[in-house]
Amino acid sequence: MKNIQSLRNRKGFTLIELLVVVLILGILTAIALPSYLSSVNASREGAANTNARALATAVQGKAVTNNVYDTTLADYSTDLGGSIPLNPCTGTTTGYTITAPTSTTATITAAVGTNCGTWTPTVFSLTL
């Protein structure tokens, strides 16, 4: 009779029950975390390429008007709504490269940063 009453008055969890819950949460985290981080990296890479494409559009538009490619990144902020888009892979607005080997060709590339892991950015080639 005393054992039954002591079981009824028992409140809380035993150490074994808590350890089992912590173990289960650890296993679930170990399975889910790599997938989550991979998804985050993929979305950052996609955003960096999308921003580079928007920059390429602005570069091409200004080149059509001026008949030459300008490689100064800051010159395109007004064409992009007032500011250069943030490169989520580098965490900066200077994470894009504009190169113009000739006055009639240019390439725009998003820089590879530590926030995205290993990836190959899309190179946007432009020609006047």
Positions of predicted regions on the chain:
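Short, charge- and proline-biased low-complexity linear segments
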Residues: 27, 52-58
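Conserved alpha-helical elements of the SDR catalytic core
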Residues: 32, 39, 59
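N-terminal single-pass transmembrane signal-anchor helix
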Residues: 10-36
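Periplasmic/extracellular, small/polar-rich flexible segments of pilin-like filament-forming proteins
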Residues: 57-128
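Aliphatic-rich helix starts adjacent to a transmembrane/signal segment
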Residues: 36-54
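Conserved amphipathic alpha-helical interaction elements at protein-protein interfaces in regulatory
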Residues: 3-6, 42, 61, 65
